[in-house]
């Protein structure tokens, strides 16, 4: 059964549409948007092999002129060089202001396609068709786009909202287990920061480590509740002036872990899991939450077979240095999102180097 979640942003409202088994019907959902006839599908080779033809044929049947551009998978290709290649194809296709870039892939493809759409001709249409759990519940919603810089993740980017987020949960059946678990890290995050009922539902599940062991009803609930949580937050704070910062729970340390270990060695969800464990330890050390909160969170992460420990090769001193280049630094202070109860967090810039060394060293 299809579900529609409105994203009521004043300047650029759109919808998140969850349509199980609906990938081949995507053109029907684009029709009301009044897009121009040129659509460029951006994907990676693996995802394209699974779903590219389905999407392209659906668009062509509806009368769109369709182009494609494939970017190799992985964070190591999330660069300005890759964006330049995308621009070259957009130029050759003679994409116009009313043309559309359609992202068919995970978070990396979505971030890059969105940044390309935001910057080509100073902004063209952008549609998200996420194919990973992480992209469905997090990266595809809210308009954050961008690429990595050698010195840090997502340092180059823009806020640019899609015209539509179109989710078919059935495509997750081909997602590798490690990538599924990475997405579950973001789902657990929503339970900690916003939705205690979602957290409890995850605790009651028998196994969260594999999509094959997850009942379809629970998978649909996970996607719907997570998307709704993201929409609730983003619709109140589109450009991270305040509340939206809570979505960075686990990401402060997580981004440091990703960049210091080399993008792709530890994937984004695994790094966020390590970051959430770190945040809970810091919060308990500062007296902001009970030990039981960290215990419950850790049990969920372990049930999902996600890491909770810092990589043994990562020195705390190097982590401290990397944190100062994080996008969340304000007036020279690193902002941490710290849990106070299941479903509640606070934003703090009172986490000193000494606290980090005491809890993570």
UniProtKB/Swiss-Prot annotation:
Cellular location(s): Cytoplasm
Record-given protein name: 3-dehydroquinate synthase
Chain residues that bind Zn(2+): 186, 251, 268
Catalytic activity: 7-phospho-2-dehydro-3-deoxy-D-arabino-heptonate = 3-dehydroquinate + phosphate
GO cellular component terms attached to this protein's record: cytoplasm
Lineage: Bacteria, Bacillati, Cyanobacteriota, Cyanophyceae, Synechococcales
Listed cofactors: NAD(+); Co(2+); Zn(2+)
GO biological process: amino acid biosynthetic process; aromatic amino acid family biosynthetic process; chorismate biosynthetic process
NCBIfam families cross-referenced by the UniProt entry: aroB
Residue sites binding NAD(+) per the record: 107-111, 131-132, 144, 153
Pathway: Metabolic intermediate biosynthesis; chorismate biosynthesis; chorismate from D-erythrose 4-phosphate and phosphoenolpyruvate: step 2/7
Primary subcellular site in the record, as a coarse category: cytoplasm
